[in-house]
């Protein structure tokens, strides 16, 4: 499966994804992943950045409001069209473009930093995407990204429950089994069932790597590893959204920051 085919899947996913996420049903993003991502993000005021796999622009807009001058790309025309419409309504100076992460049309050392929020694990030829990110970042600049946690998002797993039926752990199987474009189908569980029953489920091609493969790939490309985060919901979130309890048992996400060394 190549990036063009992946783009077609995301074009088909985009309408329902945009509708549900903007209604607040992407709870893991809004309550856990994005808050941790931006807490970890360095000061970016007046820096030029690239958002790789921006989707409809939710995290791009948060980044821009922190003072960065942003270019944002996605393989999906539908996502980019929606992001551009939002930019027209509420201008933040973001330039949105439909582009592939594996062939970035930008100059070497063009950006002070790059981010990728929950996109790299959905991109075929991940090594090319990370190599391209390295190429366009200036020496001394950073690359921060979030992915599904490679230790727990595997092809086969089961929850462990106690006598009361409460989840207490996770059994992970087939950790080393590769997914190379296998389609995962789901929809946001926080959305009302009477709404999602009428919707097409998301069909998402997955491209998995083990934890060591991710880290070794970054090192091979030339990045210096800098900081990691495995986000989980804080107590206040759990009081208001107890259904997020699962995220206190295992980390659903991994956030990594690495830096392009100054030669």
Q: What are the functions of these language-model segments?
A:
Residues 112-126:
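A short SAM/SAH-binding and catalytic strip from SAM-dependent methyltransferases
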Residues 102-113:
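A short acidic, Gly/Pro-enriched loop at the edge of an enzyme's catalytic core
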Residues 169-227:
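Substrate-binding/catalytic lobe of Class I Rossmann-like enzymes that use SAM or dcSAM, i.e.
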Residues 127-142:
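A short glycine-rich, Lys/Arg-flanked "PGG" loop and its adjoining helix->strand segment in the class I
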Residues 211-263:
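C-terminal lobe and adjacent flexible extensions of AdoMet/dcAdoMet transferase-like proteins
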Residues 48-52, 56-103:
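Class I SAM-dependent methyltransferase SAM/SAH-binding core
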Residues 1-44, 58, 62, 79-82, 142-190, ...:
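Conserved class I S-adenosyl-L-methionine
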């Amino acid at each position: 499966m190549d990036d063009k085919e992946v783009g077609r899947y995301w074009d088909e996913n985009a309408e329902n994804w945009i509708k549900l996420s903007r209604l607040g049903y992407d709870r893991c993003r809004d309550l856990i992943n994005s808050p941790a991502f931006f807490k970890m993000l360095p000061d970016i005021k007046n820096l030029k950045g690239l958002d790789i796999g921006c989707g409809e622009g939710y995290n791009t807009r948060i980044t821009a409001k922190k003072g960065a001058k942003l270019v944002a790309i996605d393989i999906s025309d539908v996502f980019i069209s929606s992001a551009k419409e939002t930019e027209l309504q509420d201008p933040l100076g973001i330039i949105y473009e439909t582009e592939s992460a594996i062939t970035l049309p930008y100059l070497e050392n063009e950006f002070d930093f790059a981010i990728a929020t929950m996109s790299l694990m959905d991109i075929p030829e991940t090594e090319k995407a990370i190599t391209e990110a390295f190429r366009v970042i200036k020496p001394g600049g950073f690359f921060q990204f979030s992915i599904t946690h490679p230790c727990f998002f595997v092809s086969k797993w089961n929850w462990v429950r106690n006598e009361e039926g409460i989840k207490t752990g996770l059994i992970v199987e087939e950790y080393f089994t590769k997914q190379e474009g296998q389609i995962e189908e789901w929809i946001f569980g926080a959305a009302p069932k009477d709404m999602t029953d009428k919707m097409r489920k998301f069909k998402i091609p997955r491209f998995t790597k083990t934890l060591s493969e991710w880290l070794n790939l970054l090192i091979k490309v030339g990045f210096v590893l800098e900081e990691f985060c495995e986000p989980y919901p804080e107590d206040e979130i759990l009081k208001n959204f107890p259904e997020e309890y699962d995220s206190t048992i295992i980390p659903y996400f991994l956030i990594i920051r690495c830096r392009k060394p100054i030669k």
